[in-house]
């Protein structure tokens, strides 16, 4: 599913955010990526959907070598990946339905198929009754549910979640985690960067810890391992 072999990422300012990364992630796994702020977690996950390109080494996702992927090929590659952000990144002038449908309209799906699929995923995230609302009319938890619906509407094999509970209260964070669990149980691989100690220590999955651009710990059903 995902393979990194001797991956380095050095930025123009001289910072090395990935320092010899090697990892294999199987289809259907749920991975927490943890570590101190500035450790290289975001770079690690961004290289999986070519938001960042490795300076050297090999990054394979769904059988595609991202190191050799041309820029014009990136949008097509990303159709099999859903991304969930901490700050939701919804289009403020579009309704809930339109935000989720947008991903399918871009790839020119038939309107009838779009409507059916969008309503299916909104039912899954519990927002079928709010299809006509704008993001500004929703709570933070509801906005994150829309973001998750948008990320799965293409039926991706992989979801990358960057601090998906970071802006949410504890109760809402648990709701979002249970939703991600449900999606994972259907066979979707989830890679989630997080600082949420309680979530990692309670809902057990594989834990990959990154410090100074290196993987320092990789444990099945691991703990968060940091204070706070």
Q: How would you describe each model-predicted region?
A:
Residues 133-138, 142-144:
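Conserved ABC ATPase signature
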Residues 153-157:
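A short, proline-enriched helix->beta-strand linker immediately N-terminal to the Walker B motif
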Residues 57-65:
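Conserved ABC transporter NBD signature motif
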Residues 49:
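Helix-to-loop junction immediately C-terminal to a conserved catalytic motif
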Residues 159-162:
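Catalytic Walker B motif of ABC-type/P-loop ATPase nucleotide-binding domains
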Residues 94-102:
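Short coil-to-helix segment of the ABC ATPase nucleotide-binding domain corresponding to the Q-loop/switch region
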């Amino acid at each position: 599913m995902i393979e990194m072999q001797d991956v380095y990422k050095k930025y123009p300012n001289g910072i090395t955010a990935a320092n010899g990364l090697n990892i294999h992630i199987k289809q259907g796994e749920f991975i927490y990526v943890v570590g101190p702020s500035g450790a290289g977690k975001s770079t690690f996950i961004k290289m999986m959907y070519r938001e960042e390109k490795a300076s050297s080494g090999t990054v394979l996702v769904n059988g595609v070598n991202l190191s050799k992927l041309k820029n014009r090929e990136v949008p097509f590659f990303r159709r099999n990946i859903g991304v969930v952000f901490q700050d939701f990144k919804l289009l403020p002038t579009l309704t809930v339905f339109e935000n989720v449908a947008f991903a399918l309209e871009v790839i020119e799906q038939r309107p009838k198929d779009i409507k059916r699929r969008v309503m299916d995923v909104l039912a899954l995230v519990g927002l079928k009754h709010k299809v006509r609302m704008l993001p500004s009319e929703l709570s933070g938890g509801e906005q994150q549910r829309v973001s998750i619906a948008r990320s799965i509407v293409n039926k991706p094999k992989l979801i990358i979640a960057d601090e998906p509970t970071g802006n949410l209260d504890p109760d809402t964070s648990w709701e979002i985690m249970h939703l991600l669990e449900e999606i994972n149980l259907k066979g979707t691989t989830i890679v989630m960067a997080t600082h949420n100690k309680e979530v990692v220590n309670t809902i057990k999955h594989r834990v990959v810890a990154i410090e100074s651009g290196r993987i320092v710990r990789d444990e099945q059903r691991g703990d968060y391992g940091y204070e706070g």
